[in-house]
Amino acid sequence: MGEDKGNGDGGKLLYCSFCGKSQHEVRKLIAGPSVYVCDECVELCNDIIREEIKEISPKQDQDKLPTPHELRAHLDDYVIGQDKAKKVLAVAVYNHYKRLRNATPKDGVELGKSNILLIGPTGSGKTLLAETLARVLDVPFTMADATTLTEAGYVGEDVENIIQKLLQKCDYDVEKAQRGIVYIDEIDKISRKSDNPSITRDVSGEGVQQALLKLIEGTIAAVPPQGGRKHPQQEFLQVDTSKILFICGGAFAGLEKVIEQRAHVGTGIGFGAEVKGEADKKSISDTLLQVEPEDLVKFGLIPEFIGRLPVLATLSELDDEALIQILSEPKNAITKQFAALFEMENVELEFRDDALKAIALKAQTRKTGARGLRSIVEGILLDIMYDLPSTDDVAKVVIDESVVKGESSPILIYANSEAQTASAE
């Protein structure tokens, strides 16, 4: 079918060797040695190959499930501290994917899903832990902000939009999406506004918890490929959320007070009361380790919602030493990232130990945890990153404590080994 035929004008009309369409019926005709293929056939071949890859990839994944020890080791490469939380996450994630790979019940025993609740202050590593797990397992990952969610029918995002975002991450491959991880941040912000059910609708608090119940537990969610409430005529995708791992995280500010009230430590009055001294006071992190489901109910989460998150992990507040480690030790440490940026300019970047301590202290003062470290380093390096591309012969930039405190400019060491201090403009 690839032979040339006259087109009546004295020229030759070319035809696709596969489908027989002429060059005028297709957008593009690609020529080979005595053979032609049109763009439509190329696209069809790509679709066939993609479908075969989809069928093969789940089988290949069977042999790639890391053990809890291996998962923990990967987390250690990117996340400093939080040993207890890492252990809890490694076991929960391993069991979840083991359940998916052995979907057929044995002896009638059907394995339930164990979603995860992470409790810890801002910047303690909740999001990073979830992201790292998804990257290690090579599964689709998406994040949702609980504060933007509302009940269906109200202004805001429907909970089904979470699944739609997950589908977007894997090019609307339903099978792949059903092996994904969803991280819902700020989950504490959808707590019930009062202990007693209100006669008015709480569309962004308890209402969202109710809407999330079925999604987290497992349901067949009908999701439009284009998302949202538009395009009502289009065909919906059916996604089984019982196979998706949901990780919810929040700072739960004030939860420690609820726990202390339950513990009744040093709360009595009178001559026989136990008085709580300074030495008996626990840190917020230590108090959160004692959290019970009843404390979360008191905080404002409904019992049914807590029941869908059986695995609980608490993250401790990061101290100065941990922040210093985060700055320099992980594979993608902030100082290593900026050193790589400077290396592109053929310049070495050095942070002295006293500079790292000063940066950690500044982050502690701001109470932003590890999340605030990048913005601090960005601010310190702003002027030098602005000037460096226009400066010749700089071989090394040194950052010390005085630079972090704003008392001096970075030390520039030139290629001729003569050290100078960059003069402030």
Swiss-Prot record:
Keywords: ATP-binding, Chaperone, Metal-binding, Nucleotide-binding, Zinc. InterPro entries: AAA+_ATPase, ATP-dep_Clp_protease_ClpX, ATPase_AAA_core, Clp_ATPase_C, Clp_protease_ATP-bd_su_ClpX, ClpX_bact, P-loop_NTPase, Znf_CppX_C4. The keyword Cytoplasm does not apply. GO terms for molecular function: ATP binding; ATP hydrolysis activity; ATP-dependent protein folding chaperone; protein dimerization activity; unfolded protein binding; zinc ion binding. GO terms for cellular component: HslUV protease complex. It holds the Pfam family AAA_2. NCBIfam families: clpX, PRK05342.1. HAMAP family: ClpX. Belongs to the ClpX chaperone family. PANTHER family: ATP-DEPENDENT CLP PROTEASE ATP-BINDING SUBUNIT CLPX-LIKE, MITOCHONDRIAL, ATP-DEPENDENT CLP PROTEASE ATP-BINDING SUBUNIT CLPX-LIKE, MITOCHONDRIAL-RELATED. This is ATP-dependent Clp protease ATP-binding subunit ClpX. The gene is clpX.
